[in-house]
Design a protein with these regions (language model features):
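Enrichment for repetitive, rod-forming helical segments
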Residues: 26-27, 75, 79
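Short, charge/polar-rich alpha-helical segments
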Residues: 1-28
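Short acidic DE-rich linear segments
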Residues: 2, 77-83
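Short, charge-rich amphipathic interface segments used for partner binding and complex assembly
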Residues: 37-76
Length: 83
């Protein structure tokens, strides 16, 4: 399982990084000087907060990050003998 988990974790990290770039690109179409930090706080920018495409892409990123956290937790539990 560690090799499988490692491969999955690597793939998921690549997906997260790609989606972060995509979210930032969409954000910069609305707010040209948006930073990676800004996209973590879209409520500070009405243009981002109300844009459906931004929210869609941000939701996908949130899902990937949630899955990444769950996978890490599962791997940690398995390595500590917790089921």
């Amino acid at each position: 399982m560690p090799n499988d988990a490692s491969s999955i974790a690597q793939l998921l990290q690549e997906m997260v990084e790609h989606q972060q770039s995509k979210v930032l690109k969409v954000a910069r179409e609305l707010v040209p000087d948006a930073t990676p930090e800004d996209i973590r706080n879209p409520q500070d920018f009405p243009e981002l907060f109300t844009d459906t495409l931004f929210n869609y892409e941000d939701g996908i990123l949130t899902g990937y990050l949630t899955l990444q956290t769950a996978l890490r937790n599962q791997v940690n539990n398995e390595s500590n003998g917790i089921e």
